[in-house]
Design a protein with these regions (language model features):
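Conserved beta-sheet core of the metallophosphoesterase superfamily
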Residues: 1-70
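A short C-terminal boundary segment appended to hydrolase-like catalytic domains
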Residues: 56-101
């Protein structure tokens, strides 16, 4: 949020990604910058950030390392749609999307 407020009015959008889980905090800031903390990921939805769940759960429970395998199936694509004014560069709308539902 701090970066969004700092850049408000200087950039069209501030979109983050790290946890791969889309946040429901999309908004237009006061000076015309669109903001969302985390857009989300594109990949297998029935997973832990794209990895098969079994090994991740085992590591979580035991603290022991293991080989992570990429998950397959139930693909989703997370995205954020930003509308902006071509003359000013300011955002006029923001909407989060999850395709494949």
């Amino acid at each position: 949020m701090a970066l969004g407020w700092y850049l408000d009015g200087r950039v069209t959008a501030v979109l983050g990604t790290h946890t791969h889980v889309p946040t429901a905090d999309e908004r237009l800031l006061h000076k015309g910058t669109a903001y969302q903390t985390d857009v989300g990921m594109s990949g297998p939805f029935d997973s832990v950030i794209g990895v098969e769940t079994e090994m991740v759960v085992q590591r979580f429970l035991t603290g022991m390392p293991g080989k992570f395998e990429a998950a397959k199936g139930n693909p989703k694509m997370c995205a954020t749609l930003i509308a902006c004014d071509g003359a000013t560069g300011r955002a006029t709308g923001i909407r989060r999307l999850m395709l494949g539902e």
